[in-house]
Amino acid sequence: MTSSTGTGGTGSAVGTGSTNTTVGTGTRGAGGGFHLPAGSAAAGPYALDIDPRRAGWGYSSLRVVELEPGGTHEFATGESEWIVLPLSGGCTVEAEDRTFPLRGRPSVFEGVSDFAYVPRDADVRITSSGGGRFALTGARCTRRLPARYGPASGVPVELRGRGNCSRQVNNFGAAGVFEADQLIAVEVLTPGGNWSSYPPHKHDEDRPGVESELEEIYYFEIAPHLPADGDGGAVPGLGYQRVSPSGPGSATDVLAEVRDGDAVLIPDGWHGPSIAAPGHDMYYLNVMAGPGLERAWLICDHPEHAWIRGSWEEQPVDPRLPLYHAPTVEGEGE
């Protein structure tokens, strides 16, 4: 078995201006805080390796594996269900005597990807003839569902918010869209200069029909600036992520400069905004899971900021969106 890893993301360096403010005694990740700069949570074959043990919580996991052309990665799913999602490149996923060729995509900024779901208590093999970077989104679970393929054409692409709060959400693993036991996973794309995850919201209490209790991971990729004349090469981008305590017992307090390949752990608290710097589109992959009997994404807006939703009624969606559409059934595999 061969497996190749790098420092995470698309290779952009994490600058020295990265800011991470944490207070209290809340959950800590592999890097000692809630903000994990690219490479700080690498382990073994993974450029990023977040599991319940490392995060100090109960359910959510995220791994990123980078394969050279012809590379292979094998893993056991253990107590978790997983979705294998190409971030760049394509691959073949083998599990449960099933084989799922994934077309993938050139990058997260260039298309919706197909994906493969693999159940708990299974052995999985990922092979990539052309090489690429692949996210493994996971959640501890009880039910054992069948391995299956998720077509890109079946991914609902949602335009959320208005004005400079416009963003695109690829709901590939959302509750009510794709069946899983506990895992919820979506992609969010924010045009440069816009805010997303806004208004700030939380999902850290189990209130049936009102709010879900969900741990969450944000994994970021930031589009570089490409000078028109090619002079000097690509300029790395950045963004910002805010998380604030939501009440007694919530100690998650983060103001982080996030760059390509960074991750932020959110065990609790108000999270948002996620801010994309002008000229640099922002991508983040959200992975969520929790103890609730109902697999649902129910959120509570911050009361001081919830009014912003009413202001969107008179504003258009950012004309830069969508950055792309899901392919038609006929277009897949072309």
Feature annotation, model-predicted:
Residues 132-172, 278, 285-334:
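Double-stranded beta-helix
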Residues 2-3, 24-74, 81-90, 316-319, ...:
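Hydrophobic, proline/glycine-rich low-complexity stretches
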Residues 251-265, 270-299:
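Catalytic core of Fe(II)/2-oxoglutarate
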Residues 40-74, 166-217:
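A short glycine-rich, His/Asp/Glu-containing loop-to-beta-strand
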Residues 54, 61-127:
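Extended, compositionally biased flexible segments
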Residues 3-28, 227-233:
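Intrinsically disordered, low-complexity terminal tails and inter-domain linkers enriched
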Residues 109-129, 139, 257-278:
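Conserved metal-binding segment of the jelly-roll/cupin
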Residues 78-102, 118, 192, 204-262, ...:
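Glycine- and acidic-residue-biased ligand/ion/polar-headgroup-sensing regions
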